[in-house]
Amino acid sequence: MDIKEVTNKGLKGCGCLSIGFFLLLIVIGIFAPDPDEEEVEKLKKELAEKVASETEQKDTVVVNDVLEGDPYQELDDLIGLGSVKEEVRSLANFVKLQKEREAKGLKTAKVSYHLVFYGSPGTGKTTVARIVGRIYKDLGVLKKGHTIETDRAGLCGQYVGQTGPKTDSVIVKALDGVLFIDEAYSLVPEGGAGNDYGQEAISTILKRMEDYRDRLVVIVAGYKNEMQRFIDSNPGLQSRFNRYIDFPDYSGDELSQIFKMYMKKNQYTLSKEAETYLKERFDYAVAHKDRNFGNARYARNVFEKSIQAQANRLANEKDLDKDKLTELTVDDLKGGFASRANI
């Protein structure tokens, strides 16, 4: 009985947790003392596709396939992030020119489409990753341009033999699009635990980046120092990731703009006094921020708490007109800024 026959029989009725262990048995040669390496690799891919199609991933794997609209316009419409927009535009221009040279039969420079995004939480890394995927589709780099968002929990298993198939199944979903790994540095804990499953996930990702070099773009993201440690931890990562984009924290004025963006989307307005108070409070938050400052997430949280404060204020009033229902006052904003979460 050959490896494939044993594998197919073993998969019938197997749960997701059993697949990784079964694959491990094959690899170490229990069923085939001298397995053909090419055959084993082929089976790994088939197993990953079975996991992807027949099982549910954890909540830490998010599919973003909204591909409508102009990605360049969406990039321009983002609040702040001037240097980020410039970097993405520069990358797009370079790729476009290389495609033109290729079409004319000229030599082309080698382009690495994989990216490192570093910056604090809430600075737009995930949003820009989605836009980059769509730009790559527009340029003909990717067929679909969708984004699969994940993190350590979405890639690593809890037991021996789970991580490889689990990581593979996420990669299969990302083919022809972008695999976005948030807090990628968590795959390499400080101190470099030798038996950590994160190392297995990295090895699998690097292998698939080579196998699917024309179908997969990987973007890794996280804090600057931690991401540098992550890249430096593995020569394979160093050779594949050589373009870095820095996402700066938002200014107080930019956070005010983000707050007002949520207001506009939800049909709210500010009183004149509240307008001044809003800017002062965001300036204060930026001046007193720590490493975990939430940036745009913080602005969204303040907005959500402010409209809750307004609802509490107006709950017992009668005959509410549109002005009262839409206007946020200083007292409402005080309720919004009351919590120091993510400051």
PLM features: residue spans?
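C-terminal engagement/docking regions of AAA+ P-loop ATPases
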Residues: 309-343
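Canonical AAA+ ATPase core
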Residues: 186-192, 200-248, 265-266
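Pre-Walker A (pre-P-loop) alpha-helix and adjacent loop at the N terminus of AAA/AAA+ ATPase modules
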Residues: 71-113
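N-terminal Sec-dependent export signals
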Residues: 1-66
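Short glycine-rich substrate-engagement loop in P-loop NTPases that contacts/grips substrate
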Residues: 144-174
